[in-house]
A protein has these predicted regions:
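Active-site-proximal specificity loops/subdomain of glycosyltransferases
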Residues: 1-15
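Generic surface-pattern signal
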Residues: 10, 77-80, 84, 155, ...
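Conserved catalytic core of nucleotide-sugar-dependent glycosyltransferases
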Residues: 17, 25-106, 118
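C-terminal catalytic/acceptor-binding lobe
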Residues: 92, 98, 103-206
Length: 206
């Protein structure tokens, strides 16, 4: 991840925002633009789906994450100044996104948790309750938020979600909220997943 952000800054040094995603990630670009419009690109921002390994908090790479230009410059400069130390740490680690997150922290760039907008899985596997079966905080109810990204998406899922988003954009105001139509699509996918894997979904009323 660190070589990637280093190369990205040198090849595209004048962007306001940098969006990093994996091959099986999916981004709803229309809602990403709305999300970015709520942030200040002149500030050092590193945001995504929160993950934790040991004491290191970081943005999950598969869920995609965003970095402002000031934040990217800070972390690249820090990486250049501490390259040997960071690469030694990397050699003993298994998660490149965690190494990147630790480097942001060490460089003085705080992590911003962008969950539930950035999701760790695809719609049919989005959890409605926590692992202990207690309901999520009402302010963080998954179906009351606007999605930006998903992970573990197959090629067929990506195509279906892309078609859904483009159809929605064609039929609606570009700046309106995807939420109601998204629910229909997501609930359909959730039902498919239940049939496919024989699972039950514990969903709060919409």
């Amino acid at each position: 991840f660190l070589p990637m952000v280093n190369k990205t800054l040198h090849e595209r040094p004048d962007m306001k925002w940098y969006v990093f995603m994996e091959a099986d990630s999916f981004i709803l670009w229309s809602t990403l633009q709305q999300y970015l419009a709520t942030l200040d690109p002149t500030k050092a921002i590193y945001a995504g789906k929160q993950m934790l390994i040991a004491n290191d908090m970081f943005a999950h790479g598969g869920s995609a994450f965003i970095v402002s230009r000031p934040a990217l410059r800070i972390v690249v400069d820090y990486y250049s100044a501490h390259k040997a130390e960071i690469e030694k740490f990397t050699d003993g680690h298994w998660a490149g996104d965690c190494v990147l997150g630790k480097t942001f922290t060490d460089a003085g760039v705080p992590f911003t948790n962008a969950w539930p907008a950035f999701q760790v899985d695809y719609p049919g596997l989005v959890q409605y309750t926590r692992a202990d079966a207690r309901p999520n905080n009402q302010k963080l109810r998954l179906w009351c938020g606007t999605p930006v990204s998903y992970h573990h998406m197959s090629a067929a899922m990506v195509e279906e979600m892309w078609d859904f988003e483009q159809d929605w954009i064609d039929r609606n105001d570009p700046v309106s909220n995807l939420r109601s139509q998204y629910r229909k699509c997501s609930l359909t996918e959730s039902q498919r997943s239940q049939r496919r894997y024989g699972t039950k979904t514990f969903s709060p009323p919409l």
